From Swiss-Prot:
ZnF bounds (C3H1-type): 178-206
Residues recorded as bearing Omega-N-methylarginine in the entry: 1245
Superkingdom, natural source: Eukaryota
Segments of skewed composition (Basic and acidic residues): 1268-1281, 1292-1308, 1860-1870
Principal cellular location given in the protein's record: nucleus
Coiled coil: none
Compositionally biased spans, kind Low complexity: 1388-1431, 1941-1956
Gene: Helz
Annotated localization: Nucleus
Protein name as catalogued: Probable helicase with zinc finger domain
Amino acid sequence: MEDRRAERSCEQACASLQRQDYDMALQHCTDALLSLGQYSMADFTGPCPVEVERIKIESLLYRIASFLQLKNYGQADEDCRHVLGEGLAKGERAFRAVLCCMQLKGKLQLVSSILAKSLSGESLNGMVTKDLTRLKTLLTETETATSNVLSGCHVEDLDEGSCNGWHFRPPPRGITSSEEYTLCKRFLEQGICRYGAQCTSAHSQEELAEWQKRYASRLIKLKQQSENKQLSGSYMETLIEKWMSSLSPEKVLSECIEGVQVEHSPDLSVTVNTKKSHQTWTFALTCKPARMLYRVALLYDAHRPHFSIIAISAGDSTTQVSQEVPENCQEWIGGKMAQNGLDHYVYKVGIAFNTEIFGTFRQTIVFDFGLEPVLMQRVMIDAASTEDLEYLMHAKRQLVTTAKRWDSSSKTIVDFEPNETTDLEKSLLIRYQIPLSADQLFTQSVLDKSLTKTNYQARLHDLLYIEEIAQYKEVSRFNLKVQLQILASFMLTGVSGGAKYAQNGQLFGRFKLTETLSEDTLAGRLVMTRVNAVYLLPVPKEKLVQSQGTKEKVYEATIEEKTKDYVFLRISRECCEELSLRPDCDIQVELQFQLNRLPLCEMHYALDRIKDNAVLFPDISMTPTIPWSPNRQWDEQLDPRLNAKQKEAVLAITTPLSIQLPPVLIIGPYGTGKTFTLAQAAKHILQQQETRILICTHSNSAADLYIKDYLHPYVEAGNPQARPLRVYFRNRWVKTVHPVVHQYCLISSTQSTFQMPQKEDILKHRVVVVTLSTSQYLCQLDLEPGFFTHVLLDEAAQAMECETIMPLALATKNTRIVLAGDHMQLSPFVYSEFARERNLHVSLLDRLYEHYPAEFPCRILLCENYRSHEAIINYTSELFYEGKLMASGKQPAHKDFYPLTFFTARGEDVQEKNSTAFYNNAEVFEVVERVEELRRKWPVAWGKLDDGSIGVVTPYADQVFRIRAELRKKRLSDVNVERVLNVQGKQFRVLFLSTVRTRHTCKHKQTPIKKKEQLLEDSTEDLDYGFLSNYKLLNTAITRAQSLVAVVGDPVALCSIGRCRKFWERFIALCHENHSLHGITFEQIKAQLEALELKKTYVLNPLAPEFIPRALRLQHSGNSSRQQQSPPKVKSLYHPQSDHFQSDGIVQPNPSVLIGNPIRAYTPPPPLGPHPNLGKSPSPVQRIDPHTGTSILYVPAVYGGNVVMSVPLPVPWTGYQGRFAVDPRIITHQAAMAYNMNLLHTHGRGSPIPYGLGHHPPVSLGQPQSQHAEKDQQEQNRNGKTDTNNPGPEINKIRTPEKKPTEPKQVDLESNPQNRSPESRPGVVYSNTKFPRKDHLNPRHINNLPLPAPHAQYAIPSRHFHPLPQLPRPPFPASQPHTLLNQQQNNLPEQPNQMAPQPNQVAPQPNQMTPQPNQVAPQPNQVVQQQSQAPPQAPQPAPQLSPAFQAGPTNAFFNNAVAHRPQSPAAEAVGPEQPPPPGLPDGHSPLRAITQPGPILASPLNNFVDESSPGLPIEEALDGVHGSVALETLRQQQARLQQWSEHHAYLSQGGIPYSHHHHPHLPHLPHTPIGLHQPPVRAEWKVAGRADDETETTFSRFQDLLRELSHRDQGDTGELAEMPPPQSRLLQYRQVQPRSPPAVPSPPSSTDHSSQFANFNDSSRDIEVANSPAFPQRLPPQLFGSPFSLPSEHLAPPPLKYLAPEGAWNFANLQQNHLIGPGFPYGLPPLPPRPPQNPFIHIQNHQHAAGQEPFHPLSSRTVSASSLPSLEEYEPRGPGRPLYQRRISSSSAQPCVEEASAPQDSLAQGKESQGHSNPPAFNFPAPESWANTTSSAPYQNIPCNGSSRTSQPRELIAPPKTVKPPEDQLKPESGEVSSSFNYSMLQHLGQFPPLMPNKQIAESANCSSQQSPAGSKPAMSYASALRAPPKPRPPPEQAKKGSDPLSLLQELSLGSSPGSNGFYSYFK
C-alpha cells in the first residue's frame, strides 16, 4: 500500500501543479517523498527500486516547480542539486529514462516551462541560476530526444513499444539501405556536432551499429508481413513488383491489348487552373470476343488519396448493368458477370479525382482480364494556375556570353582616368599577385588537415589565391550586351538618395539588370559585391572590317552605384570624346566585368600584419576566472534592461585588463540583444581610465547603429569622452549616410567625400567605429599594437577569419578581444569548393566556439529572444541552440494560423536547361494564394501591412523570379521575395519558405548520404539542396519571422532527403500537433516514408510519365531528342555523330560553373524522335545521374517529386556511383569526382539508343562487366535497392538525369522485332560509342581502332543501332539450341517437347514474364527459360490474384507462351523463380547443363529462398530477396548474353555447341562440357542481385575473360535486343544504356543440374568454377561436391550493413566469387587471346597487354586498376589543369588483396584481412572489405545500394585469398526472387556475352588480377577528368590504408564533391 500511496501522492501533485495550486502540489510531493523514505533499497517487500527512483525524481521535480512558483528559490535550488546528484549518481541513463517516461506522459513540459520562465524572468543569483540552468538543459535535451523519437518513430519503434530496447537516437528517415547510415566525422573528431540530436549521421560506432540493426529488424518485419500477405497479398503491389522486375515489362502491363478497344473521355492528361478541383474520366472497354474483367485497380500509391473508382458497368453496347462499387474504391474485383454468349462485351469504368492542393498528380489504372499483359491506362492532372511564361520566354535583354577575357594582348585597354587608387592599394595589388605556378599554391599547408599556429599564414594565403581564381572564373562567365543609356546626372531616392552630376567631361551610363545578374544568382551576387569596374566595347551597327593587326579598343568605366534594378557607370572623358557620347542617347555595348581584387589583397595584408597569432589560438588548458562580486553584478550604472546573461557578458568584457582572458565570445541568435550588450559594455569601459575602444562591424548599417542608437544619445546626455570617430570608405557618397552619423565622421571641406583619418584624429577619440574593411586604414597609421585596449567585433560570424583578423593586427595578448555573433547563421560565401572544404569560409567566431569547451566562461550564450513568437523560438531553440533559447518578447499570433504552419504542394522541381537553380510551380501558386489569403486576414495586432510585413524566402533564384512575377501579376509587389542569402539582418512579420526540392531531383544524388559532403558543413550539397541540407540556411530563414513561419513544400521529400530531414520531421510533427499541417495528414506522410524506406516499389510510381514542364512541352513534341541538357560545350567524342545518342545532347557545363554553383541537375533529354507519349506520361525513365553516373529509374511525380530508382545502368561508369557512397575501387579519379564526374561521360546523356543497344558492349562483354556488376552490386547494396530488374534502383537513383542517356521511351519489344532478336543487331549490341567514356577505356572511338571484322557473334562496337530485320526464329522448337540454352540457364523446360513441365514447375506462359510475386522466386534460370522459351501453357490461376497473377510455382507467371524471341532473361528472372521441373534430367541433358545453374547459377533468389541460409541472418535473407531479384535478372541477362555467345565453339567445349547469337532462338547450348558449376566463375561477378553491378560491369577487365564471357553474354544480347514496351520507359532506358555485363553471369554452361534447383545458390557458381578446368584447384574442395558446402567460414553472414538489398549475393552458402569482380583471386594465368576476339576486346587488348584485364571504367575492379599497369597511357590529359593537379589519387581504390585474404568467417575479419593478405594478388579491395559492418573501415567498400552487405570478393574461387563471394553478400532479399540463377538474366543485365568458358574466365581473371597488382598510376588533367572516363589507378594496398572509418571517410571526402574546383584531386 505504501508504494501505491507514494505514487498516488505524486499523481495528485502533478494534478495540483496543472491547476496552479502550488501549495497543494508541494504538500503532495512531500507526502510522496516521506512515503518513499520508509523503504530502504534492500527492502524486497517494497516497490522495485526502479519504481521508487522514478517516483522520487518525479516528486522532486514537481517540488522544484512549486517552489519556483512560490518564489522560494533557495529550497528550489536545494532540491535541484538533490535531483541532479541523485540522478547522476544512479547513472545518467536511468535518470534520463525517468525523464523520458515523464515526457511521454506529458508531465515534463509542465516542469520545463516553469523552469524556463523562472530563469528568464527572475534575477536569480549565480549559483541558483547555474543549477537550474543545468536542470533545464537536461529537461530540454530529454524533450528533444523524446520528441525526435516520437516524430521519427519508425515502424520498428512502434512495433516494439516506444523506444524499447534501443539505446540511441532513432535513425534518419528516407534511408533505403542500412549502408546509407554514416558516422559523423565532426562529432568523432571534435566531440561536438552542430546538428546535435538532429544529425543524420551516427555519433558513435555503437549508434551506427544500432541503426543498422534497426534497419535490419524492419526488413525482417517487412518480410514477415509480406509472407503473411502472400496469400492475400496486395494485387497492386504484386503487379508493380512484377512489372518492375520484369525485363519485358510490356508483357506484364501494356497500354493496349489484343481484342480490347479502349475509349476514354476527357483527355488522359488534364490541366486545371484551380486548386480545389474535381475531375472524372470514363473508360469504355469493348472486348471482341467477349472476355471477363476480373479486376480494376489503381496502382500508384503516392497520390492514391486523390483518386478513386466510382462506377463500373458491364453489358453489350446497348444495355449496361451497374456493378457494385464500394466508396473510395481503389481496387474492384469482378468476375461475376454472365456474358451469355455475346460476341462482344462492353465495360464502362468511371475514375474520379479530387484535390485541394496544387501539384501534379498521376495515376495508373489497370484492367485485368485474367491474362497478361494487363491493360493499363495512365491519367495525369496538373493543378496549377495559368502560367504566363512571357517573362521567361521573352528574349533576354542581356545576351550573356562566355567569352575570352579582354586583356592587353587581345584588346587595347583605355584605363579610366583619373585613377583614384591610392599608392597603398596599388602596392597591395602588385604585392599579392596570384602565383603563376599553381605548384606554389598547393603547398603542404593547404594539405594539412586543419589550421594550426604554424601553418596559419601560409595556408590562408594559398586558400585566398584559390578562392580568387574561383571568383575570377565565376565573373568571367559573363559578357553582357546591353543598351547603355548615357546620362549627365541621375537621382537616387530613399535614405541614401540624392542627385549626382557628371563633371570634367565625364558622363554616366545606366543599364538594367536582369535575372542573370541579380543578387539572386551566384555570379550576380559576385558582380554586385566584388566588381567595381567594367570594360566597355561599343558594338557597331554594321560590322566594320578590321584591318589585320589592329586591336579593338575597350574602355574602362567604374561602377558608380548599384540598385536593385540598375547599375550606373561613370564613363571617362577620353571614352566620351572618342565615341562621341552625348547625354540622353543610347549606345549598344558589350560589357565585361572586372573583379575587384582589393578586398582579397587586403586579407592577405591582414594575414601578414599579424605578428603573433597566439591570440587566435588561445590556450584553453587553464580555465580563466572572471571575477564576480555583488557590486559588479548589481552595479547601478548597468542598464536595468540587461538580463542575467547579458550582465554576465558585460562583466566578462569589463573584467580588469590585469586579468588576461582569451577572446570572449558573445553568442546569440538574432534578437537576443548582442549589439545592445556590446554598447552597454562600451559605456562601462569608458568609465575606466586609460581605455580605448575599437568597435568593428561587418556592415556599415550595423556600425551606424552603434552611433545612432547608443553612442549619440550617450554623448548628448553629457558624456563627451564617449564621442566616437566613425571611419568611412573614402569613396562612399556622403549623401548616402545618415545625418546623425555625419557629425562623427571626417568629411572634406567640399562636403563631398569622406577623408582618411590621420594618427592625431585617432588619438583624439577614445571610441573608433569602423567596418572590417575600413579597419585597414588604421593599420596603416603606425598605431602600435595594444593602442586599443578593447576590440569589440560585432557580426563576427558573417565574416571569414581572414577578414576578422584585420583589426586584430592592432591587438596584443593583453588586449580584451570580444567577438559577438550567431554561429548558427549563414557563413560567408566562398566560391571555391576546394577552399570551402578547407574551411576558408569559417569565421573566427565559429572556429573559437568549437575550440572552447562547453562550459568555458568566455563562451557566453545570450538566450532571451525578444523578436519572435514563442513557438518559433522554441523550435529554433530545441533544434539549433541546445534548448537554451527562451522567448521574452510578446509577439501576437494569427487566430487561424499557428506560428509554425505547413502547406503541402506536391509539385515537381524543375531545372532550366542552362540554370543551376530549380523552380517548382506548384509551390509558386501555393505561396501566392496563401499570401493573398493572409493579406485578407491580416490581424490588427500585427500593425500596418507594409513592405517589411511579408517575406518570401527560397534558396533558388529561379523560384524567386517566378514567385515575384506571379505576385506582380496579382499587384502584390510590396511582398519581399528574396533568396535566403540576402535576408540576413532583415525581419518580417510573416515569412513564407518555399523549399522547392522534391525527391525527384535530389534523391539520386544523395545516396549513401554523400560520404564527403555529409561531413562538410557548407558543401555543394548544401548549396544545391537548400533547406534540405543546410541547417544554417534553415535557421537563418526561420529566425527572420516574428509571428508566423509558413512553409510550402513536399513533406515527404523534406523528411527523407538531406541533412536537415530530422529538423523538418520535427517541424511537421509540431504542425501536426497544432493542427497547422495543411494538404496532407501526418499519417499519410509516415505511411509514405515507411513505404519509401522499406522499398515498396509502388511508392515510386513505376508507370509515372516523365514530367515535362508545360513550357517545354511544345518544344518536346518536335524532335526533342536533340535537346541539350546542358549548355553545349563540346561534342562528345564518344558519340558517333550518327549515333542515337545525340552527341550534342550532352554537354559539359563549363567547369567554372561548378565552382560555387549548385551542381545542375539537368532534366534528362527527352527520348529520340517525336514523343508519342508526350501527352500521356511516359513510364519511369531510366536516367543517368549527372553527378554519379548511376542509372536512375526516374519515376516522375512520385508523391510530388519524381522518384528516382536506380536501375541497372547499361553503361558502366566507374567513378560515378561512387560519388556518394564511395567504393574505393570505384572512385578512381578524384579529380573527376571533384568536378562532377557526370561531366565525364557525355555518352549517356544523348538521345537514348534503342533498347538493348547498349547492353553489353562487346568490349565489356567480359568480366569487367562483371566487375561493374559487382561494383554496382555493391553500390546497389549500398543504396539498398533491391529490385531485380532494376537491380540498382538506388544506383540509378544516384544517377542524375544528366547522366543518363536520354531515355527513349520503351518500345514494345514485340512491336519492334528488330530490336528483339539477338541476331537482329549483331553488330550493334553495344555500340561502343554509345557508352563512351565509361565503357571505353579509351576515349577514342572504337571505330578508329583497327578491329577485326566482327564475328557474327559479336556485336560490332561501333555500329549504330539499326534495327535489323528479325531473323526468323521458330517459336520454340525443341531443337532450338538457343532456347535450350536459355532454358538450361533458367532451369526451366523450354520447350514442351523437351520436357514436360513438372507439375510444380511454372510453365512459362507466353506473355507472362515475371514470376509471381508470391512464388518463392523461381530459379532465375527457370524463369528465363520460361519466359523465353517456355511453351505456352494454360495459366493456372493463383487463388489470390486475378488470373493474371498466379501464385506459387504455378505457371501463372508465364501464362502466355513467350513468343518468338528470347525473353530477356533479366526481366523474367525477376519473378520468383520456380523450381526446376522435376523432370529435368539431372546431369545429362544439355538442357540440364545449362539450365541448372546448378550451384553455379544458383539464382540469388533461389538460393536465398532455398537455402535462405545457414549462413544468413534473416535480415540478410531479406536482403537476399531483393538481391536475388537482381541476381535473377543478371542471370537472365547472362542467358541473353549467351545467346550471343561469341566463340561458341570455344565455349561449348563440352560438346555443347553454342549457337550463334544470330539465332536467338537457338539457345547457346550450355557450356556444359565445362563441368564447372557456373557460378564459381563469377568469383567476382556480381550476382544478379547486384543489378547495379551488372550494369557497371560493362567493360571486361580481362580480355580473355571477356572473350570467354562474351560468348555467354552474347546470348544475353539476344534478349537484350528486345525492346520494352513504351510504357516501360525506364526499362528501356535501362536497356538503352550500355549495360555492364551481368555481374554474375556465370557461364551457364556447366551448370550441373543434378538436383532440381537445389543448387541454385552461388555455390553452384563456385562449384562450377571449381570444376572448371580453369580453376581447378582454386575452389575449396567442399565446393565440388555440394553446392552449398562451403567452409564454415564462408557461411558467416556478412555484416548486415553490407547486405546489399538488391545486389546481394543470394547464395547463402556460397561464397561469392568475384571472378570478374574486383579481382580474381585465383592465381590463374591469363588465357591466351583468342583470335576471334570481339572487336571490343581487341580494342582492349590493343590497350592492354594480353594478360591485363581491360580497364572498365566503372567496374569496381577496374577501379582497382591493379591490372592496369599502363593506365597512364589511357589517361587523356586535357588542357586546363596544371600538372600538379593531374596526378589522380589512388587512394580511392584499394587493394583487394587484403580483402581477398580475409577469411570469410566474418566480415569483421574481412576488415582485418584487408590488412593482411596476399598483396601481390590483387589490388582491388574486396567488396566485402568495405562491407564489413564491424570493420573499422566501413567506408571502404560500401555497396552503393545501401544494401547491407557488400559482395564478397572472390573468396570462393580463390580460397587462398579468402575473399568472400558476393553471394554472401547478396542481400537475402534477393532470395525472394531468385531461386535459381539465370545466366540470361545476368547477361542481360550485365550485358556481356560469355566469351570464354567459365574456367577460362576464372583463369584469366585471376591472372590478370595478379598480373598487375601495381598498375601504374594514371595522371589526369583537370580537363581530362572532366571529359574522360576516370581511369582507376592501381589502388594502393589496403593494408596501408587506415582502416578505421574515419580515415576512410576522410579519404573519400577528398574527392567527391560535385562542384569542386578540382584542386583536390591533386592533393589526394
